[in-house]
Amino acid sequence: MAAISVVVTSGIGPELLHQIISGSPKIKVTDASNLFRGELKGDAAAKAKLDSLLARAEVIYGLRLPQNVLARAPRLKWIQVMSAGVDRFLDIDMIDSPVTLTNVSGIHAIPISEFVIGLMLMFV
């Protein structure tokens, strides 16, 4: 069985990337954050390289998605976004597609609570 191709479109840092890569030999993680930024700046070479990665991608992980991601990633099964909301990704193509779209809703509750309490304690 071939490894599952995961394309990361947002910079997550080398330590976290290494943690994900070493998690299982059944996944192949590619950091495409520089290519994604290049595409946003109009770099045709970066777009071509990103297209090549997206053509094989089964999973995309990131804060933002490449334009026309569903058309560019025909093997795509799952998109994991790094934000709590996914409303900005829900166009008719995404809604009608078999791709699973998930978010990180709820994971920030404790850190935000601790931060707010810390700010309140500054005034005591």
Describe the residue ranges of each PLM region:
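N-terminal glycine-/charge-rich "phosphate-binding" loop or analogous flexible N-terminal tail
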Residues: 1-59
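Phosphate/diphosphate ligand-binding glycine-rich loop within oxidoreductases
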Residues: 56-124
